Amino acid sequence: MKKIGAHVSVSGGVEMAPVNALGIGADAFALFTKNQRQWVAKPLSVESVTLFKENCEKEGFDARYVLPHDSYLINLGHPDEEGLEKSRAAFLDEMQRCELLGLKMLNFHPGSHLNKISIEKCLDRIAESVNMTLDKTTGVTAVIENTAGQGSNVGNEFWHLRYIIDKVEDKSRVGVCLDTCHTYTAGYDIVNEYDRVFTEFDEVVGRNYLCAIHLNDSKKPLGSRVDRHDSIGKGLIGIDFFRRFMQDSRFDDMPVILETPDDTIWRDEIKMLRSFES
């Protein structure tokens, strides 16, 4: 069975995330543990941490199905030393927040070369950043999200993900989150070549590294390298893909997170997706 949820609001504090997830009928959720558009945030209070854990237990959310996301500002492959150090400090803070909350994963966008260094050099910096962070933390897996390849973002090709993983020293604490919109607009035809794409992922990256799914339709076409999510079945990926995905046991027992644009229909989307399983 799939564990389905969405990226829910933490307005009122991180402790509200499990409450908001329950409100849409979810059994998984994603959240930001701080303002995603600010470099620095005040530390999590003891009260917020305690309430978050209590609410997760009360509402029945297992930490294995909670997928926190780091700040959009962070670029672990930054070509400039100042930007790189700033990103590394912020990423460490995010990882430490996950530790405090008792969470098992931190999802992140790998980074961008900003047309100043090669793809390989950028990937090297990302892996080094992950290694530095894992050395200073325990119990939290760094989960690399594939990208659409917009601008100078890396992570749009499966080999990029494998390259980073190969250079991470603690293989037990690195994984991948596949975003269906990003996969499609990066040029992988999950609509017409479903089996081939996921077989390629298994061969290049390794299914054992797959930790989570971001389940989104796409407003932009195959190979466009533009990241614009759409509601399930309303975009160019189409409903048949999502029906097939929900019946594919390879994606059981991991958080499947909606980042679709209309949060007023998340409950309906989750209900529809669950109906495809039976």
UniProtKB/Swiss-Prot annotation:
The family database entries (Gene3D superfamilies) matched by this protein are listed as:
Divalent-metal-dependent TIM barrel enzymes (3.20.20.150)
Name the UniProt record assigns to this protein: Probable endonuclease 4
Would you say which domain of life the source belongs to?
Bacteria
The note on the cofactor says: Binds 3 Zn(2+) ions.
Known SMART domains for this protein? AP2Ec
As its record notes, the protein acts as a catalyst of:
Endonucleolytic cleavage to 5'-phosphooligonucleotide end-products
Q: What InterPro entries does this protein map onto?
A: AP_endonuc_2 (IPR001719), AP_endonuc_F2_Zn_BS (IPR018246), Xyl_isomerase-like_sf (IPR036237), Xyl_isomerase-like_TIM-brl (IPR013022)
Alphabetically sorted, this entry's keywords are:
DNA damage, DNA repair, Endonuclease, Hydrolase, Metal-binding, Nuclease, Zinc
Q: What does this protein do?
A: Endonuclease IV plays a role in DNA repair. It cleaves phosphodiester bonds at apurinic or apyrimidinic (AP) sites, generating a 3'-hydroxyl group and a 5'-terminal sugar phosphate.
What GO molecular function annotations does the UniProt record carry, in alphabetical order?
deoxyribonuclease IV (phage-T4-induced) activity; DNA binding; DNA-(apurinic or apyrimidinic site) endonuclease activity; phosphoric diester hydrolase activity; zinc ion binding
Q: NCBIfam families under this entry?
A: nfo (TIGR00587), PRK01060.1-4 (NF002199)
| Enzyme nomenclature, EC number | 3.1.21.2
Any one Gene Ontology BP term: base-excision repair
**Record: residues binding Zn(2+) 1:** 69, 109, 145
Originating organism: Phocaeicola vulgatus (strain ATCC 8482 / DSM 1447 / JCM 5826 / CCUG 4940 / NBRC 14291 / NCTC 11154)
